[in-house]
Amino acid sequence: MLHRRELLLTAAAAGLMGATRKPAMAGGARDAALDRYLQVLAERYLTQSPEAATSLGLDKGARVALKSRLNDRTWAAVETDRAFCREGLKGLAAFPDAGLSVQARLNRDVTAYALGLGRDAAPFDYGDNTLVSAMNEAATPYVVNQQTGDYAGTPEFLDSQHQVQSAADAEAYLSRLHEMAKALDGETDRIRRDAGKGVVPPDFILANTLGQQKDLLAIAPADARFVTALGRKAHEAGLPGDFQARARAIAEAEIYPALTRQAAALGALTSRAKPDAGVWGLPDGEAYYRWALHEATSTDLTPDEVHRMGLEQNRAIEGRMDAILKANGLTQGSVGARMAALGRDPRYVFPDTDAGRQQILDYLNGLIEAVRPKLSKAFDLKLKAPVLVKRVPVDIQNGAPQGYMNPGAIDGSRPSIYYINLKTTENWPKFTLPSLTYHETVPGHAWQGAYLTETGKLPLIRQILSGFNAYVEGWALYAEQLGDEIGMYDADWAGRLGYLQGQKFRAVRLVLDTGLHAKRWTRDQSVQWAMDNLGRARDALTSGVDRYCSWPGQACGYKVGHTEINRLRDKARATLGPRFDVRRFNDLVVEAGAVPLTVLGKVVDAWTVSGGRMSL
């Protein structure tokens, strides 16, 4: 698929193997010097992203001051981010291959790639296109939208990430509430700045965002989640004093007025908003989408190539689904129509009630426990990968993704959290849940992330810069495939259909994302095409299309990454023959850490050249 890189990857693999054959020349003073510089970069990054410090459990000791801060949301912070990337790349250029070990070269190359993403975003002086955004969720042309912005992210962050075990922790939480008001105003200034450049979200994105903000403002400050969360945390920690009352006072005096100002700024754009869904209408929109696609996939694939990939894989997967449906007596109508009918079968429907939602949460926990004993079929690695299962908070469920994972802390103080959007149980026929769960938990995101937190083998900068979308989401989609390969669907034909439907969904995403942004598809056209091909509920598919509009390119990383991991596996198997061990291959991909696909190709090629013996 990514054939244009083959020659480069082979040469790079030879270079890596050359390093392994000369151990006396590597792993010494030059490695130590690089490690020191990477640590400097890590500390600078954390000062720019104190929220990352908290999420990773690093806001302690010498970094405790970071616990009182939120990320700076002003345009000045964007300029700081880009200067950091430029300076970091200049510093890394002082560390050529000579004298560096394989692992050191890998650390350097991954860090340089990440910094290059931030540097290359400079021509697009709107939206939120920075190193921090690329490593966090996704770059976006709209500073505030239905899924990105301080109003949506900070309440969830404070509730799930900010730990309160002492009075100092509670005071830090209160400091962050003051910061939240400043962050909202910083975003509002950028909204107006971008509007002056002709950057206004599509009308449906604007309406959804304003609707969510209106819902938040309708909640009394005393009942706001970021207020009650502090009260709960302080009570659980046995802290004296009324921290909740102090939080309410900040909400009333600072946060609600700032959110009201932001909603007014967005509302003022309503008359200018258009129904055009794609970024092609933005300044340098076509170039922006090429950058976004590169950032999301870590390849040089063009929109047309990605679109064709999606169409081809959609057809192939549909053929597999058709055979299973026919084998089980479902022969009439398109695959999408038959899957829609199966989704309405009472055997697979959860009640759309609080009790039904709890049934889903219980079922997900059971799936996680059932897959753990079978992981030894796919890995030699022994990881714990603890996971909590929670529903997406009600106050953000209208714009939130259908399912996602918050990674655990590096120090193990907080497990990964698997969130599922239970706005309606209609979106979750039972057969769709196993593959989603393997994707988000084990052997997917939680497993891959656990290698970082449980082994401590990667330097801090690599643990921080771990948001390479195509690797992270490609691995999680590959994990769904591993669920099939280790037998999780052997007695569950509907579950296997759900798995294939999920694979088909990701192929369809390639078509939709490129259709919206490169081929000028409308929102309605995209939703209808998705319904015709997937047979899933309109509500869920509309939410997905809106997501692709706000995060261009991001949804393409899943299938591009999954396809590349399989290409590398097939290539290694063909080269090694009987020496190929799929468990060792899977371990290698995890042990590489989150990396761009170009770098992953170098690692796998070097491993193959070593006869499958190289270790990281």
Set out the residue ranges of the language-model regions.
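N-terminal maturation segment of proteins
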Residues: P23-L616
